[in-house]
Amino acid sequence: LWNRLYAALYMRTTDDGQSYGQDDLDPFLWPSSTYLLTEPRHGQILALLNEFLDKRGDNLIAQPLKRAFFQNDLWAIFDWLADPDAEHVEKKARFIAERQALRNRLAPIIRRLALSNEQIETLPDTYRVALASGAYPARQNPAHTEKAFLPRDLFDGHGPWVHFQNGDGKPHPFAKPTALTHVHFAGGRSTFFVFMNLPGGRQTTLDYMQKVNAFPATSGPQGRLLTSSSGALPAPSGTQFAIVRQMMLIDDKGKMRPTRLIESVQIRVVRGNMEKESDFYEFTQHRKELFDGKGLRAVKSDEVTIPVFNVRDEDVLDLPRSVRQKREAAVKGEGRVTENLRIGCTSCHTQSGIASVSSFFHDRPPGLTASERGPEVERVIRWKGEKFNWGLLQGLATEPRH
């Protein structure tokens, strides 16, 4: 039943037979998507949700890790269905009832799948599992930059990697989540931690952060460019940045809780002053491997994915193959609508050097502050707590409504 419901909600097939959604961090849903709301799939999903509720499908699997993943999967679908903007778009008005029907059934299932806080704390530390495998070196090999590395000291609060917040470390609402664009894309169902590591050690990185804070604010759309090209703030060659995505869950008391499930790690190593000279690496979780006791897996340099992050476009999987090919040809000169990590990163982080780190420039001065990860988690929880979809989920989670 779990597998059937997951497939109905997540699996997508294009007109040329390509399948997507088997094991991805996020559903292939865009604001304009309708595949959950139209027949025959809508009716199939309703039937599966009713079966899950009537037969107490939440009792079929007791393993906390699988319950955690499934709750997070359903939470993502609920949030998309609860988008307050969607019901005010004229062409989608006919889907209001369909959205409500799915939401009303998903909410109590999400609540039934909830783990206790004690169970959440026992979920595996997937980063540590990946380190223990010994599959990846701890440092970049300059002679083999094509090989991914996974720092062993990334989370060491006294090591060379500095986790930082912007906004002088103030809590929300006085400061927004540091990686706000990423948090917004993930709907607050994940926390994102941003790290920096300059050659020379932790103190060198801390000193550099203070230089960024003290640099005179510039105005206008070229503010970042002027800041970086002035020569005052070049990130030294060898500077490393990392952004870590960590799964959030809802516990059995209806509260958001962080986990030790690391969903992805993206690392960028600056070589020279131009973005094209940087090295990019990504690790992502894969649930089948994780259920077998394994951790994160490196994304291959030629591996491609559907562009979902920060893309507000029509549902590309519904487009005819010929249209997808033409669109992709205009960008990459080849067929399917896919992108690799490097293209995905540089589409937003277009500037060179320090100006490419968007978290530095939410505010000027940015108020960069070395921080433990706990305060950033609290920022995200408070940010999410203000959202319409969170309030709606809380209101619907008690009893199924048909």
Model-derived features with residue positions:
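Sequence context surrounding c-type heme c attachment/ligation sites in exported
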Residues: 1-19, 257-402
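Generic structural hydrophobic/aromatic packing signal, biased to beta-strands
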Residues: 196, 209, 241-243, 265-268, ...
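Glycine-rich, aromatic-lined ligand/substrate-binding cores of catalytic
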Residues: 214, 229-275
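Long, charged, low-complexity terminal extensions
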Residues: 1-227, 232-235, 239, 352-402
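A short linear-motif detector with a strong N-terminal bias
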Residues: 220-222, 243-247, 325
